[in-house]
Amino acid sequence: MATFKDACYHYKRINKLNNTVLKLGVNDTWRPSPPTKYKGWCLDCCQHTDLTYCRGCTMYHVCQWCSQYGRCFLDNEPHLLRMRTFKNEVTKDELKNLIDMYDTLFPMNQKIVCRFISNTRQHKCRNECMTQWYNHLLMPITLQSLAIELDGDIYYVFGYYDNMNSINQTPFSFTNLVDIYDKLLLDNVNFVRMSFLPASLQQEYALRYFSKSRFISEQRKCVNDSHFSINVLENLHNPNFKIQITRNCSEMSFDWNEACKLVKNAGAYFDILKTSHIEFYSVSTRCRIFTQCKLKIASKLIIPNYITSNHKTLATEVHNCEWCSVNNSYTVWNDFRIKKIYDKVFNFLRAFSKFNINIGHCSSQEKMYEYVEDVLNVCNDERWKTSIIEIFNCLEPVELDDVKYVLFNHEINWDVINVLVHSIGKVPQILTLENVITIIQSIIYEWFDIRYMRNTPMVTFTIDKLRRLHTGLKTVEDDSGISDVE
């Protein structure tokens, strides 16, 4: 059983404030939610289990029980998850406020301990002080957190997470902030709490405390497309698709890291809860993570033989050719932008390849084919440039004054001509490596200009950012007809 979950279940009975703050979906009646196979820690109840996606950020960080309350660590309502979430630079004073919140919600004194022991011993089989009956008393106060970086902002979700060595398929990584506070001060807090426990439970408490307060922080993970809801990924290839999210909001005016101080004044806390409401947002999928996902899928479907072919049709419109036909049944081709990029890139590659080396037709087997698979994946700058350089070198360029050139005198379509004029100012007869890189970048940037894209989608924005963008009508970017260049 998850220690944090058990502590919330038992401690919520001691007063009105706790009954409100410590209310977890996992301790209430279960409501069905989409089952998944993602393993990790639920940020709401801290148990390690199968996770489902959050309705506030579409990432997998909530269990199927807690999902009924729709809480997200990015909310603006002072529920327990939000009050345990800190952002960016965390100071010693802010950590002291967090410890005070824990001490307020999970007090440990002689009266509380006797009360819990008395309630437990009403059952004949529970006369001994066994850990399974007193799990809620064995939750130490630690500065253990799950951290995530979203577009330059680092969020720390504090809690008590059991079984730290279990499978973690989420973008969150364990981080220990005890050094920012003070190990000895934290030790003293826990030794005082431990002194109220029966001797048979003190050893277990101490073991749990030291294992969760002395661990080495993990390396921070990179967020990728697999960390977001499969429902979002399945609809990425629809340019008009918008992600629907809900956020729990309130009129909370505190600085981000000071939300935990609200429990010190129960009256003020309940006044803020009276302003609680849900806000709905429809946001664009436009970001580097999802763009790279689409370009990677398209890269796997590349048919390099088109470069050596003599087809008059565009690369994605070749049919009944054993070597050049593209499988159009994949949903990635539903995005007309991907098709336009693919057609232009391969029309250009064919034009400057066929004039420089003696190549035949569709069935030709050329060395450059092995480098073509990364030609669309511009998000991975190192691999992409390596791919272009290798293709360029396969064309046996002529070197003059330490600059390599290839000839460019082959038929191209009007769309590519427009790109050439826009990117290098003319339709050239010779090309350098820099010209080739600039031209292919221009083709891709016309629709997906990753230079100006945020890394993660807008679903990871705080409510303040979402409100500002919503006011400026920028949460929804209509991708159906206007390119980045336009």
Swiss-Prot record:
RNA-binding: annotated segments: 1-81
Assigned keywords, A-Z: Host cytoplasm, Host cytoskeleton, Host-virus interaction, Inhibition of host innate immune response by virus, Inhibition of host IRF3 by virus, Inhibition of host IRF7 by virus, Inhibition of host NF-kappa-B by virus, Inhibition of host RLR pathway by virus, Interferon antiviral system evasion, Metal-binding, Phosphoprotein, RNA-binding, Viral immunoevasion
The UniProt record lists the keyword Metal-binding: yes
Single GO term (MF): RNA binding
Region (Zinc-binding domain): 42-79
Region (Important for cytoskeleton localization): 82-176
Stored InterPro entries: Rotavirus_NSP1 (IPR002148)
PTM characteristics: The C-terminal region is phosphorylated by host CKII/CSNK2A1. Phosphorylation of the DSGXS motif is essential for host NF-kappa-B inhibition.
Entry protein name: Non-structural protein 1
Example GO BP: symbiont-mediated suppression of host cytoplasmic pattern recognition receptor signaling pathway via inhibition of IRF7 activity
Segments carrying motif pLxIS motif: 480-483
Region listing for Interaction with host IRF3, in residue ranges: 317-486
Record's function text: Plays a role in the inhibition of host innate immunity by inducing the degradation of key host factors required to activate interferon production such as IRF3, IRF5 or IRF7. Associates with components of cullin RING ligases (CRLs) including CUL1 or CUL3, which are essential multisubunit ubiquitination complexes, to modulate their activities. Recognizes the host NF-kappa-B regulator BTRC through the presence of a DSGXS motif in the C-terminal substrate recognition domain.
